[in-house]
Curated annotation (Swiss-Prot):
It comes from Homo sapiens (Human). The modification Omega-N-methylarginine is found at R833, R840, R850. One of its GO terms (cellular component) is cytoplasm. Residues 8-73, 297-347, 388-412 have a biased composition (Basic and acidic residues). Ubiquitously expressed. One of its GO terms (biological process) is positive regulation of neurogenesis. There is a cross-link at K150 (Glycyl lysine isopeptide (Lys-Gly) (interchain with G-Cter in SUMO2)). The modification N-acetylglycine is found at G2. The modification Phosphoserine is found at S4, S67, S74, S136, S493, S540, S570, S679. The gene is SRRT. This is Serrate RNA effector molecule homolog. One of its GO terms (molecular function) is protein-macromolecule adaptor activity.
């Protein structure tokens, strides 16, 4: 029995050893290295055998259920969690067990952090899988870190002690100027060949871009004047309760911009009739038609089953499907009448396929990505539905081929030019040109245009892109075909761009007040003056200088605008009645605060204001109430997408202070739009290194005049030899005039970039400042950064999760006085479970008693500091 028990115990222990993790295998190897002399543990084996015999009879045929092994033999096995889970601040652990897990709460032990300032870990390894999926380069090379400007204190260390303070300040200012000049030149050389940079500053590209922008602006102006002449603006008010009429007007403007005719505008009336002709039992689909750019009634019936599947997934689509949630009412009735609705759908699709050709394919493409995921339990139903959908698709296609024959001599059907399908590309590398994307997407039918956003310096000048297609295409099929295509080692990874959910959005209803409306008329007129002059929209010729602001504008909507800016007062009546000062209250003060007034609405002023705001929105793509300009809107999928209007009337009375505060805040927001594009003065440009074209040409000629020997000179551009340098110079100007022109254009290219006060640049990296005496910051947060829950993901150090929000984690508040070390022992590098203990309240404030079970470092240095002593911080 002894030998069999030996084997029994060994097998039991080996079984549990095999289930242990790598953390315990080193101990297993150590034990086996010492040999399998189990007689040394006879005391333990005997004790366990006796304990089994005392409590029950031993039976070999009976399956034993063993409790976990004893603690002195191995760590307890009932929990798959290590000791540092409970004691995350234990300094004895090496910190290298889980390098992929993050330790929160503060600085960590372990390998040193990457180069550079801790605020600049952009696109680090922990976000690579996500970024690679979204279309960025698979392996991102951060390259050489950009140089950081020295602080004045660091600069003083490089100077001799004999330099006095005035000279040191002067030298430091010269150093800063040289540093910025060098940074600017390096940036120019790094990006001069990229399309976005050349289109902004190169003289040839700038001219083309201005001409295209001017042509698009004049087209929008013609559309606005056409709509105004046909009476589209006569009874239109920019109030939230007129949202349907506003959307209809925006759609009409888009149809006109796309080259549509009055006949094409009839489709807006047809859509409205179809919406009103819906069944009374069904929920109203007018709002849905607004939000999704007006889907037809026949389209909805055709895809009735798709809507039923979508109802179960509405919770995932918060922002895009607000209006569709109404469909969930009466799902039971829809399910009971499923077969009838399918038959009606087929009939309606046959009747309306001439008006809505290709709508079925759009419906499949316009649903959100989350709705495209299929469930395994519905495989058979989906297969049947797919077959039916294919049959329904084939019928419209057959009739589409017959349609041109029938309509050859008949009236043309109105085209839905205001509806489009589009793809969104999140990350487009700066070295990819628009022409490359256009040539790639032109292969697919229905392609219309490409829009690219401005490059983002914080994302390595990557851009976002939108590719617009005709409404009749199957956008999901095109998206799938483009999914794995790479351009210049960059994955495009397109996604289907959803339709706008709320095209009309409202702001505070206080904007209906008469005083605010009059102020808005003044600001809107000033904006129109500024934008018209900047774009030279009303100039007779492109070369004509803009009209001075003192002269009346040729813009017809500004005619007699001053009549509405003059406020009429009853001064004589007040004098006769004996009013000493200020206008008398229009009505006796009611109960409550007498300083409060009712919102007074003047319909005449509002009508004048709305015409100005529509001019800004349609012609200049400026949303007045949102105080922003929509750039490149002509290239976007929606050429007139969103507009902000006045909200409902405030239910309560308003104070005079609220009116003044609103006006002041609104004018501050509009200031950037009113300001003229800034450029450097001549003096500042010279300091920054402005280049002279003549000097640069001389440098070019000198560098291409090489002396080979006595009376022997070479022109390296052509390889010809001459007897003197003057002959080489004459040869270059005569035979290489295009090279001279290139030099002059390059100088103008650089000077255009230099004189732009808002020129793009790398994000400035500021050295870390020591915390001030009253500065309290969460761990891992540096001055100038937002709080952890607002910090961009790319700005977090490598391998660490976001630090706890202020007041909720370990060391959430640092001591006000800087000490020699951290307030608490640091969490080890890669603390398990994301340092969950930090969120359980261990150490919410300095001085809180620590958990007695947590082992502290016995070698911790006891430090004494005079709290009354001034901080050892130098200020310059």
């Amino acid at each position: 029995m002894g030998d069999s028990d030996d084997e029994y115990d060994r097998r039991r222990r080996d079984k549990f050893r095999r289930e242990r993790s790598d953390y315990d295998r080193s101990r297993e190897r150590d034990e086996r290295r010492r040999g399998d002399d189990w007689n040394d543990r006879e005391w333990d084996r005997g004790r366990e055998r006796r304990s089994r015999g005392e409590y029950r009879d031993y039976d070999r045929n009976r399956r034993e259920r063993f409790s976990p092994p004893r603690h002195e033999l191995s760590p307890p096995q009932k929990r798959m969690r290590r000791d540092w889970d409970e004691h995350s601040s234990d300094p004895y652990h090496s910190g290298y067990e889980m390098p992929y897990a993050g330790g929160g709460g503060g600085p960590t032990y372990g390998p040193p952090q990457p180069w550079g300032h801790p605020d600049v870990h952009i696109m680090q390894h922990h976000v690579l899988p996500i970024q690679a999926r979204l279309g960025s380069i698979a392996e991102i090379d951060l390259g050489v870190p950009p140089p950081v400007m020295k602080t004045f204190k660091e600069f003083l260390l490089s100077l001799d002690d004999s330099v006095d303070e005035t000279e040191a300040v002067k030298r430091y200012n010269d150093y800063k100027l040289d540093f910025r000049r060098q940074q600017m030149q390096d940036f120019f050389l790094a990006h001069k060949d990229e399309e976005w940079f050349r289109s902004k500053y190169h003289p040839d590209e700038v001219g083309k871009r201005r001409q295209e922008a001017r042509g698009a602006l004049q087209n929008r102006l013609r559309v606005f004047l056409s709509l105004m002449e046909t009476g589209w603006f006569d009874n239109l008010l920019l109030d939230i309760d007129k949202a349907d009429a506003i959307v209809k007007m925006l759609d009409a403007a888009v149809i006109k911009m796309e080259g549509g005719t009055e006949n094409d505008l009839r489709i807006l009336e047809q859509e409205e009739e179809e919406e009103q002709a819906g069944k009374p039992g069904e929920p109203s689909k007018k709002e849905e038609g607004r939000a999704g750019a007006g889907l037809g009634d026949g389209e909805r019936k055709t895809n009735d089953k798709d809507e039923k599947k979508e109802d179960g997934k509405q919770a995932e689509n918060d922002s895009s499907n607000d209006d569709k949630t109404k469909k969930s009412e009466g799902d039971g009735d829809k399910e009971e009448k499923k077969e009838d609705s399918e038959k009606e759908a087929k009939k309606s699709s046959k009747k309306r396929n001439r008006k809505h050709s290709g709508d079925d394919s759009f419906d499949e493409g316009s649903v959100s990505e989350s709705e495209s995921e299929s469930e395994s339990g519905q495989a058979e139903e989906e297969k049947e539905e797919a077959e039916e959908a294919l049959k329904e698709k084939e019928k419209p296609k057959e009739e589409e081929w017959e349609k041109p024959k029938d309509a050859a001599g008949l009236e043309c059907k109105p085209r839905p030019l205001h509806k489009t399908c589009s793809l969104f590309m999140r990350n487009i590398a700066p070295n990819i040109s628009r022409a490359e994307i256009i040539s790639l997407c032109k292969r697919y039918p229905g392609f219309m245009r490409v829009a690219l956003s401005e490059p983002q310096p914080e994302r390595r000048f990557f851009r976002r892109g939108w590719v617009t297609f005709d409404r009749s295409v199957n956008i999901k099929e095109i998206c799938w075909n483009l999914q794995n295509i790479r351009l210049r080692e960059c994955e495009l990874s397109p996604g289907v761009n959803r339709d706008l959910t709320r095209r009309v959005r409202n702001i505070n209803g206080i904007t209906q007040h008469k005083q605010i409306v009059r102020n808005d008329i003044k600001l809107a007129a000033k904006l129109i003056h500024t934008l018209d002059d900047r774009t030279q929209l009303w100039a007779s010729e492109p070369g004509t200088p803009p009209l001075p602001t003192s002269l009346p504008s040729q813009n017809p909507i500004l005619k007699n605008i001053t009549d509405y800016l003059i406020e009429e007062v009853s001064a004589e009546e007040e004098e006769l009645l004996g009013s000493s000062g200020g206008a008398p209250p229009e009505e006796p003060p009611k109960e409550g605060n007498p300083a409060e007034i009712n919102v007074e609405r003047d319909e005449k002023l509002i009508k004048v204001l709305d015409k100005l705001l529509l001019y800004l929105r349609i012609v200049h793509s400026l949303d007045y109430y949102n105080t922003c300009e929509y750039p490149n809107e002509d290239e976007m999928p929606n050429r007139c997408g969103i507009i902000h209007v006045r909200g409902p009337m405030p239910p309560n009375r308003i104070s005079h202070g609220e009116v003044l505060e609103w006006q002041k805040t609104f004018e501050e927001k509009l200031t950037p739009l009113l300001s003229v594009r800034e450029s450097l003065s001549e003096e500042e440009a010279q300091k920054m290194g402005r280049k002279d074209p003549e000097q640069e040409v001389e440098k070019f000629v000198t560098s291409n005049t090489q002396e080979l020997g006595k009376d022997k000179w070479l022109c390296p551009l052509s390889g010809k030899k001459f007897k003197g340098p003057e002959f080489v110079r004459k040869h270059i100007f005569n035979k290489h005039a295009e090279k001279i022109e290139e030099v002059k254009k390059e100088v103008a290219f650089f000077n255009n970039f230099l004189t732009d006060a808002k020129r793009p640049a790398l994000p400035e990296i500021k050295p870390a400042q020591p915390p001030g005496p009253a500065q309290i910051l969460p761990p891992g947060l540096t001055p100038g950064l937002p709080y952890p829950h607002q910090t961009p993901q790319g700005l977090m150090p490598y391998g660490q999760p976001r630090p706890p929000i202020l007041g909720y984690g370990a060391g959430a508040v640092r001591p006000a006085v800087p000490t020699g070390g951290p307030p608490y022992p640091h969490a080890p590098y890669g603390a398990g479970r994301g340092n969950y203990d930090a969120f359980r309240g261990q150490g919410g404030y300095p001085g809180k008693p620590r958990n007695r079970m947590v082992r502290g470092d016995p070698r911790a240095i006891v430090e004494y500091r005079d709290l009354d002593a001034p901080d050892d911080v130098d200020f310059f």
